[in-house]
Amino acid sequence: MFRPLVKRVVTRRFLAAANNSNAHIEIRTLEDLAKLQSLDNVDPKLISKLINDKTNELNIKNELQMLKQLQAEEQKTQETSLKKFVRPAWIFLLMGSIVYLSCHYVWWKLDYEEKELEYTHKVHQLESELAALNEAHNSSVSSDKNSKRSSRKWYKFW
């Protein structure tokens, strides 16, 4: 009969001592709250204030970490920005060279054909002049021969 009574009294004293120890502990952080056995004697406003403070602290840490990551990514993109344009620059130079050389070849070929036509026309013109001069020369030579033969005496031929 006394045993259950003693057990109850000891349990109550232990709980009262625990509550008194909670009252004497100064609560400043959530870790202090975690050390307590119960939150019965703790002001709810204090709990919400501690939770809000910890949340703000974690948010600030996350924002700082995110800013550091953004700065690192920005530096990385600034370093690799030149690398992004090297291959397109080579492709542009190659394509430009191909276009330039093909246009130059077409221009050269057209110029060659134009000069070839001009030179063939000039050759035909000079050939006709040469033929006319040759014909004129032959006719003058034959007339000179005829005139020389007539002026010679017939016996001089022998």
Swiss-Prot record:
Stated membrane topology is: Single-pass membrane protein
Keyword entries, A-Z:
Chaperone, Coiled coil, Membrane, Mitochondrion, Mitochondrion inner membrane, Transit peptide, Transmembrane, Transmembrane helix
| Family recorded in the similarity comment | Belongs to the INA17 family.
* General function of this protein: Component of the INA complex (INAC) that promotes the biogenesis of mitochondrial F(1)F(0)-ATP synthase. INAC facilitates the assembly of the peripheral stalk and promotes the assembly of the catalytic F(1)-domain with the membrane-embedded F(0)-domain.
Question: Which residues constitute the organelle targeting sequence?
Answer: 1-15
Residues in the signal sequence: none
Can you state the subunit structure given in the record? Component of the inner membrane assembly (INA) complex, composed of INA17 and INA22. Interacts with a subset of F(1)F(0)-ATP synthase subunits of the F(1)-domain and the peripheral stalk.
Where are the coiled-coil regions? 110-140
Q: Which residues cross the membrane?
A: 86-108
Task: Tell me where in or outside the cell this protein is found.
Answer: Mitochondrion inner membrane
Could you tell me which residue ranges are on the Mitochondrial matrix side of the membrane? 16-85
Report the gene name.
INA17
The protein's name: Inner membrane assembly complex subunit 17
Q: Which GO terms describe its cellular component?
A: mitochondrial inner membrane
User: What is the predominant subcellular site recorded for this chain?
Assistant: mitochondrion
Q: Which regions face the Mitochondrial intermembrane side of the membrane?
A: 109-158
The beginning of the lineage is: Eukaryota, Fungi, Dikarya, Ascomycota, Saccharomycotina
